[in-house]
From Swiss-Prot:
Subunit structure: F-type ATPases have 2 components, CF(1) - the catalytic core - and CF(0) - the membrane proton channel. CF(1) has five subunits: alpha(3), beta(3), gamma(1), delta(1), epsilon(1). CF(0) has three main subunits: a(1), b(2) and c(9-12). The alpha and beta chains form an alternating ring which encloses part of the gamma chain. CF(1) is attached to CF(0) by a central stalk formed by the gamma and epsilon chains, while a peripheral stalk is formed by the delta and b chains.
Protein's UniProt name: ATP synthase subunit beta
Catalytic activity: ATP + H2O + 4 H(+)(in) = ADP + phosphate + 5 H(+)(out)
Matching PANTHER family: ATP SYNTHASE, ATP SYNTHASE SUBUNIT BETA, MITOCHONDRIAL
Name of the encoding gene: atpD
Cellular component per GO, a single term: plasma membrane
Topology in the lipid bilayer: Peripheral membrane protein
Amino acid sequence: MSSGKIAQVIGPVVDVAFAAGDKLPEINNALVVYKNDEKKSKIVLEVALELGDGVVRTIAMESTDGLTRGLEVLDTGRPISVPVGKETLGRVFNVLGDTIDLDAPFPADAERQPIHKKAPTFDELSTSSEILETGIKVIDLLAPYLKGGKVGLFGGAGVGKTVLIQELIHNIAQEHGGISVFTGVGERTREGNDLYWEMKESGVIEKTAMVFGQMNEPPGARMRVALTGLTIAEYFRDVEGQDVLLFIDNIFRFTQAGSEVSALLGRMPSAVGYQPTLATEMGQLQERITSTKKGSVTSIQAIYVPADDYTDPAPATAFAHLDSTTNLERKLVQLGIYPAVDPLASSSRALSPEIVGEEHYAVAAEVKRVLQRYHELQDIIAILGMDELSDDEKTLVARARRIQFFLSQNFNVAEQFTGQPGSYVPVAETVRGFKEILEGKHDKLPEDAFRGVGSIEDVLAKAEKMGF
């Protein structure tokens, strides 16, 4: 291993000088520097630029407090490597793959893999478009997820993003035996802590690996932590042959950290002050998230939209990679409809007859048409009342309200709070239920029978209890 000395420290940027004739470290190599405390604490640096004259510019993955000029820096000869495999399940890691959950020590002999890899080649990719059944009616019917696809999750505070994420993790684990990897990128430490304890309480932590690089950490850690989570997910896909769910919260913070690093490295800023390499960095991350012939990594990415401006380069670059969007709407929360997924604003590339089948596509299209018409009639109803509607419109409104309530369902992970057992509804049951509502088979049942239930049989059972 070649070694150099710190030449200068500018915040999270550290320049390291190597002696003439020494082998310079490659770009993305991890360097290690020990502070002046008898080598008890070390800092990992990642090589970003070669400046010439034996000097490399690096980005620190931890705070550079305590570093001084002249300290020795060792080249590890490889990129940052993180633990992979079944031992990672139920544990919480940082960007470097160190455990931060204060649990039992992690096995020192666990397999590790570098976070920088090439995307799968064309001949390794799976060409089939297969739906990932979630058991959540509104998603499976109107905005289905593709195996190996990328989903954008939009929603403000308190609309149920975390509960939806937990239910997806639960359903993938219970029904598909699948693994989930949760990656917290540049978000609040408190939220990560709350999520960890909630997942412990709901019992889904055993099928989940968690990786955090929160907003108090240097930009280098926030930029690379998404790759750490992805590397753990890729191992389960490529070696274990699993279908993996990868949650990234929040993909905007990945771009934001890249922008900070770019400015620190002295690159000329691009549009709105973002890094000129924005599309490349996003592409390198997103292209690794895909289906191969061995398994799949399906990612659900929470996306913060700055000032609700969807033309901002950060969200706009992420949108180019998405297959589906799931929009959570506060108005639905106020109506007591959970999950509060907006059926008209959410969309999916998978909702086509070639992928989901003719019947599913026709039912989904008709559900959207009925809900859209109901949305248009709401102003008339609010001003003039239901009496001003024609008989056909009254029937449509009644069915639309039943559809709206039937799109809600109780979640397994929320059972401890609601006291109501959760339900997993297969896609075929979902399509059949909505088809029967559209055909008018359940027009005589009360609206309340459709709220917070699973299949159409649950509606009939609830109506019977209500005396219908």
